[in-house]
């Protein structure tokens, strides 16, 4: 719920349909306002613009639906959006490699040259090494924490693992980008995830 006199809200609450993720049904409801525009962003995500009714103090946006997901161990297939893949080789403020991440990149280069099962296996190994280096711990980092800072303190959450992973993947000359969404936990709870 949000409080205010009048506002326009941008939301991305509809899952992207892919070969691994099929939307069976999905509904976005706006109480205290209405969806005035549904469009698609440059990644192919559905985006809504919602206006709050001027005579209400609160707007509540909820979504509900069913998604059939096929587990492909993180392999999504061919690139299918309009942004050229080399764009995802560029570092961001949160994914600049420092000494720890550069060292992990060197270690992974050695792993790959030793022929341990190809690129996909190497990227799964990178994921495992990042998880080992950054122990999952809430409250130790925030949205401004860089990948190198997470490696330095050795703790973080999903976003920190992702930033470290994409930083090293880019050092290895792979195109990699941050993707966020929602994660359904085993106990039925949902949380933001990356």
Each language-model region and where it sits:
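Short, small-residue-biased leader/transition segments that mark boundaries at the very start
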Residues: 2-9
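Residues at beta-strand starts and edge strands
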Residues: 5, 22-24, 57-61
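Beta-strand secondary-structure signal
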Residues: 10, 27, 60-64
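Solvent-exposed beta-strand/loop surfaces of large extracellular or lumenal domains
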Residues: 15-50
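Hydrophobic/aromatic-rich core segments of domains that either
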Residues: 113, 128, 160-194
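Intrinsically disordered, low-complexity acidic/polar segments
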Residues: 6, 20, 70-74
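Short, solvent-exposed beta-strand/turn "edge" segments of beta-rich domains on protein surfaces
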Residues: 52-56
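Secondary-structure boundary elements
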Residues: 62, 67-71, 76-77, 82-156, ...
